[in-house]
Amino acid sequence: MARNKIALIGSGMIGGTLAHLAGLKELGDIVLFDIADGVPQGKGLDIAQSSPVEGFNAKLTGSSDYAAIEGADVCIVTAGVPRKPGMSRDDLLGINLKVMEQVGAGIKKYAPNAFVICITNPLDAMVWALQKFSGLPANKVVGMAGVLDSSRFRLFLAEEFNVSVQDVTAFVLGGHGDTMVPLARYSTVGGIPLTDLVKMGWVTAERLEEIIQRTRDGGAEIVGLLKTGSAFYAPAASAIEMAESYLKDKKRVLPCAAHLTGQYGVKDMYVGVPTVIGAGGVERVIEIELNKDEEAAFQKSVGAVAGLCEACINIAPALK
């Protein structure tokens, strides 16, 4: 049986971490791609040289030619410029939109049957543009946001309550940015909703709101600390979880930026929602009941994403 092929488009900090994780988990053979010739080849060689020590079987190669991604089963896209301190994800729009156009053309030509996971920011607009530029079916193109945002929320909650992260589930809806909507009543510790934990005196509503705000600012907090770049370990781990669910047909329930066709009252846009990911790509979008406040917060988030998509159309009218 042929091994799966994983193409990593963009070989920066996230790309290199993705390659290492995909190798350790033996998800398949790995191709690192980057327009900066030498970088993907060097990182591929370095990680490959760890395989005898780590004991994993995966072929790693690097290339600056899109032909190298031919026939990939999964493409994970991190190409583009990362955030610097003081930049919002949206400041990156013009630069990274042009990158998505090139990446979309490369995937369309060489890996039209791939499951594509986009990580490039501003996420919700970039994954929307990438799907249009590539022409791939919308259920085969997703954005990595919710898994990371939920993971941050889970960590902060586990630290607050001094419990294992494994026993914390968290629910985050909406765009990947300042308007994301972490939902407390759908988030649990050992199956107990956070709203009940407030009643039980484990945490005050005010403290919970602080944790929710820290989750929203999770990426910016790391950008501020690093000063020279943005997060890469947790984003890479999050994308690998999605890729693994697709490759192994796990049917994991994972929050992703998915293409909506009327769910939550949203059409032809990518927004963070709970999905089921299996061999068919996004096999299902799970539509939950929102109360009035949650609905208002979600619609505000949708509005922010819509504004970014409009800005994309102004730059590249072909996206309309």
UniProtKB/Swiss-Prot annotation:
<dbReference type="Pfam" id="PF00056">
    <property type="entry name" value="Ldh_1_N"/>
</dbReference>
<dbReference type="InterPro" id="IPR022383">
    <property type="entry name" value="Lactate/malate_DH_C"/>
</dbReference>
<feature type="binding site">
    <location>
        <position position="83"/>
    </location>
    <ligand>
        <name>substrate</name>
    </ligand>
</feature>
<keyword id="KW-0560">Oxidoreductase</keyword>
<comment type="similarity">
    <text>Belongs to the LDH/MDH superfamily. MDH type 3 family.</text>
</comment>
<feature type="binding site">
    <location>
        <position position="152"/>
    </location>
    <ligand>
        <name>substrate</name>
    </ligand>
</feature>
<dbReference type="InterPro" id="IPR001236">
    <property type="entry name" value="Lactate/malate_DH_N"/>
</dbReference>
<feature type="binding site">
    <location>
        <begin position="119"/>
        <end position="121"/>
    </location>
    <ligand>
        <name>NAD(+)</name>
    </ligand>
</feature>
<dbReference type="GO" id="GO:0004459">
    <property type="term" value="F:L-lactate dehydrogenase activity"/>
</dbReference>
<feature type="active site" description="Proton acceptor">
    <location>
        <position position="176"/>
    </location>
</feature>
<dbReference type="InterPro" id="IPR001557">
    <property type="entry name" value="L-lactate/malate_DH"/>
</dbReference>
<dbReference type="GO" id="GO:0006089">
    <property type="term" value="P:lactate metabolic process"/>
</dbReference>
<feature type="binding site">
    <location>
        <begin position="10"/>
        <end position="15"/>
    </location>
    <ligand>
        <name>NAD(+)</name>
    </ligand>
</feature>
<keyword id="KW-0520">NAD</keyword>
<feature type="binding site">
    <location>
        <position position="89"/>
    </location>
    <ligand>
        <name>substrate</name>
    </ligand>
</feature>
<keyword id="KW-0816">Tricarboxylic acid cycle</keyword>
<dbReference type="Pfam" id="PF02866">
    <property type="entry name" value="Ldh_1_C"/>
</dbReference>
<protein>
    <recommendedName>
        <fullName>Malate dehydrogenase</fullName>
        <ecNumber>1.1.1.37</ecNumber>
    </recommendedName>
</protein>
<dbReference type="GO" id="GO:0006099">
    <property type="term" value="P:tricarboxylic acid cycle"/>
</dbReference>
<comment type="function">
    <text>Catalyzes the reversible oxidation of malate to oxaloacetate.</text>
</comment>
<feature type="binding site">
    <location>
        <position position="96"/>
    </location>
    <ligand>
        <name>NAD(+)</name>
    </ligand>
</feature>
<feature type="binding site">
    <location>
        <position position="121"/>
    </location>
    <ligand>
        <name>substrate</name>
    </ligand>
</feature>
<feature type="binding site">
    <location>
        <position position="34"/>
    </location>
    <ligand>
        <name>NAD(+)</name>
    </ligand>
</feature>
<dbReference type="InterPro" id="IPR011275">
    <property type="entry name" value="Malate_DH_type3"/>
</dbReference>
<dbReference type="InterPro" id="IPR015955">
    <property type="entry name" value="Lactate_DH/Glyco_Ohase_4_C"/>
</dbReference>
<dbReference type="GO" id="GO:0030060">
    <property type="term" value="F:L-malate dehydrogenase (NAD+) activity"/>
</dbReference>
<dbReference type="InterPro" id="IPR036291">
    <property type="entry name" value="NAD(P)-bd_dom_sf"/>
</dbReference>
